[in-house]
Amino acid sequence: MSMVETAPSKIQVRNLNFYYGKFHALKNINLDIAKNQVTAFIGPSGCGKSTLLRTFNKMFELYPEQRAEGEILLDGDNILTNSQDIALLRAKVGMVFQKPTPFPMSIYDNIAFGVRLFEKLSRADMDERVQWALTKAALWNETKDKLHQSGYSLSGGQQQRLCIARGIAIRPEVLLLDEPCSALDPISTGRIEELITELKQDYTVVIVTHNMQQAARCSDHTAFMYLGELIEFSNTDDLFTKPAKKQTEDYITGRYG
């Protein structure tokens, strides 16, 4: 299964192949990412799920030996064409990485930094944007009295929510999360999962996770990948309760991976 017919598509992947040098890492991937829903990518290490995620904002262009072939349509426009404005694409498609990566600056400036690249706001408007982003990331009440302290002064879970706030401050349309909870404790993980569920009201969210329970709790749709291939893509409840492919069933029941 490669299509999920529910909400309108925000991202459409068509015949996508990806290479690290001569290594064929993604093989003829086809799937639709639903707008304003959460889509999870699961599969064993090395299956290609993070590679696929990073094609959505062309992170691979930082590395000359990596290349993508096929189409990735964002609202109908193929982002893989050379005419695509990378800065504009990454404003539309934000990303949060596995380990919290606050900038070496204040909590306030962590949020304002990206906004300043794309918008010229008055101080009052910037203050409002910072509060809005931190509130969306469920971090405002914990930081409102120390906005000028370093982002490094926050706990790991708070730092990850700061990174999410930073990502949404420029008001993207899509938010990519690459194993955002793998370095966090269970309480922080629970807060991030609640946040992911809330964020889909305003954003299309795509998350890579090793944690199948997390995918089941957070996502509307789940893609199972194995050795660079998309094995199954379905509504999350269906994929975990009545998988269509034996490989999927074997993985979610712990028989391999």
From Swiss-Prot:
Presence of keyword Transcription regulation: no
EC number: 7.3.2.1
Broad class of the protein's primary localization: membrane
Topological category with respect to the lipid bilayer: Peripheral membrane protein
InterPro entries in the cross-refs: AAA+_ATPase, ABC_transporter-like_ATP-bd, ABC_transporter-like_CS, P-loop_NTPase, PstB-like
Places the protein is found: Cell inner membrane
Binding site for ATP: 43-50
Enzyme class name: translocase
A Pfam family reported for this protein in Swiss-Prot or TrEMBL: ABC_tran
Domain annotation ABC transporter: ranges: 11-252
Secretion signal, residue range per the UniProt entry: none
GO cellular component annotations of the record: ATP-binding cassette (ABC) transporter complex, substrate-binding subunit-containing; membrane; plasma membrane
Complex and partners: The complex is composed of two ATP-binding proteins (PstB), two transmembrane proteins (PstC and PstA) and a solute-binding protein (PstS).
PANTHER family named among the record's database cross-references: ABC TRANSPORTER I FAMILY MEMBER 17, PHOSPHATE IMPORT ATP-BINDING PROTEIN PSTB
Family label: Belongs to the ABC transporter superfamily. Phosphate importer (TC 3.A.1.7) family.
Protein name: Phosphate import ATP-binding protein PstB
Species: Escherichia coli (strain K12)
Gene this protein is translated from: pstB
